[in-house]
């Protein structure tokens, strides 16, 4: 499939350029950042620091690099030349206008470090993840299928070329390790890093246990923590923090681990077909990952900062997802991969929600049912409706 696929974040990108002198767009490699900024700002000059010669010029003479270029400039993979950021500050302050620079980056840690040192208060921050199901449906029409989307994920090149995930992801992972991981860490044992990535896939939607990962991979707990931080910084995985209230209930302190893209997750688990997906012992965890990640994308694409948590206490009461992004309308969401709804799915919603202040209108179970409906306890939302919510 060819042609530009409109991204939901496009409107927010334009607003940020009206409000700030600098706009930063971060996200994983190949999520569509370069395509989006070129389409959103067609009159801007464009340079990419992936080019070794351009990167060298930026590192050796940042003053000339900035002053000799257009007032409207896109700098792709800007994290490769952190010394540019102080010069961008000087020049943007001199001009005093909005929308001067658009910076993209695949390494959030390096980008935010440079922004924090030089551009604090001058930059509008946005994140672009791979396609959401809603974006893909808008592009493909009714052909978009939830189960197929889980297996393929949302990386644009996969959908633009029709490339099989089993061909795309090995190259993606190898490139990621060579360019991003090697640039931040001394990863001498690449086999161990691959092993950790595969084990993370097996632990998805579960509590993160650094000690267990350390034993399974055969490296120190400190190394695991360092590697996980890089996976998070480069938008491969993220953690959902447990919800904490002021009550006396003992709540878990460990976060849960998720992947930003279910296609990568399924590849690491060896899942290549819908049949393998629904028969997999990991299907429930993968489905939970889908709903959590797509909820996050929805908020990010609206320019909001997601406030997502999970609930688990010592009474073994658990709610898969708490969404406080809109403080006036919080959500408590149980996530079930079943095609049939059972009342037991909502058994913790009433008691926990009464305690933490989420009303009946915010209580729901997202499942693979054919259509959404209401029960006395909660709303039962078909996954296609949850993913397609505007």
Question: What positions do the PLM features span?
Answer:
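N-terminal pre-Walker A segment at the start of P-loop NTPase domains
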Residues: 1-14
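Hydrophobic anchor at the beta1->P-loop junction of P-loop NTPases
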Residues: 25
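Conserved lysine of the Walker
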Residues: 33
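Hydrophobic positions on the alpha1 helix immediately C-terminal to the Walker A/P-loop
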Residues: 36
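Conserved catalytic/switch belt of AAA+ P-loop NTPases
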Residues: 85-103, 107, 117
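Short regulatory helix/loop adjacent to the ATP-binding pocket of P-loop NTPases
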Residues: 109-124, 140
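Accessory nucleic acid-recognition modules appended to NTPase machines
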Residues: 163-330
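Domain-level recognition of nuclease-like catalytic cores that cleave nucleotide substrates
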Residues: 368-390
């Amino acid at each position: 499939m060819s042609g530009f696929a409109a991204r939901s974040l496009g409107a927010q990108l334009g607003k940020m350029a009206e409000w700030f002198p600098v706009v930063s767009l971060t996200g994983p490699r190949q999520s569509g950042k370069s395509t989006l900024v070129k389409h959103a700002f067609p009159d801007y000059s464009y340079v990419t620091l992936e080019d070794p010669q351009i990167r060298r010029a930026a590192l050796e003479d940042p003053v000339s690099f900035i002053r000799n270029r257009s007032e409207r400039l896109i700098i792709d993979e800007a994290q490769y030349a952190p010394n540019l950021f102080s010069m961008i500050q000087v020049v943007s302050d001199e001009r005093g206008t909005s929308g001067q620079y658009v910076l993209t980056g695949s390494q959030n840690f390096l980008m935010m470090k440079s922004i924090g040192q030089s551009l604090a208060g001058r930059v509008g921050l946005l994140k672009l993840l791979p396609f959401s199901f809603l974006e893909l449906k808008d592009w493909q029409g009714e052909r978009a299928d939830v189960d197929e989307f889980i297996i393929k994920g949302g990386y644009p090149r996969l959908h633009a070329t029709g490339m099989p995930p089993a061909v795309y992801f090995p190259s993606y992972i190898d490139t990621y390790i060579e360019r991003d991981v090697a640039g931040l860490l001394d990863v001498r044992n690449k086999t161990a890093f691959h092993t950790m990535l595969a084990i993370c896939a097996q632990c998805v939607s579960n509590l993160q246990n650094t000690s267990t990962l350390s034993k399974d991979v055969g490296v120190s707990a400190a190394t695991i923590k360092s590697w996980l931080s890089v996976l998070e910084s480069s938008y491969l995985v993220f953690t959902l923090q447990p919800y904490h209230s002021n009550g006396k209930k003992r709540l878990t302190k460990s976060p849960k681990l998720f992947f930003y893209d279910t296609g990568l997750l399924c590849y690491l688990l060896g899942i290549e077909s819908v049949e393998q997906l629904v028969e997999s012992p990991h299907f429930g965890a993968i489905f939970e990952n889908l709903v959590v990640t797509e909820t996050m994308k929805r908020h990010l694409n609206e320019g909001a900062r997601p406030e997502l948590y999970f609930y688990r206490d010592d009474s073994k009461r658990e709610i898969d997802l708490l969404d406080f992004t809109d403080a006036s309308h919080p959500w408590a969401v149980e996530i079930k991969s079943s095609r049939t709804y059972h009342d037991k799915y909502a058994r913790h919603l009433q008691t926990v929600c009464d305690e933490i202040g989420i009303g009946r209108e915010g209580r729901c179970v997202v499942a693979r049912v054919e259509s959404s409906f209401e029960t006395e306890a909660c709303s039962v939302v078909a996954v296609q409706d949850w993913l397609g919510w505007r």
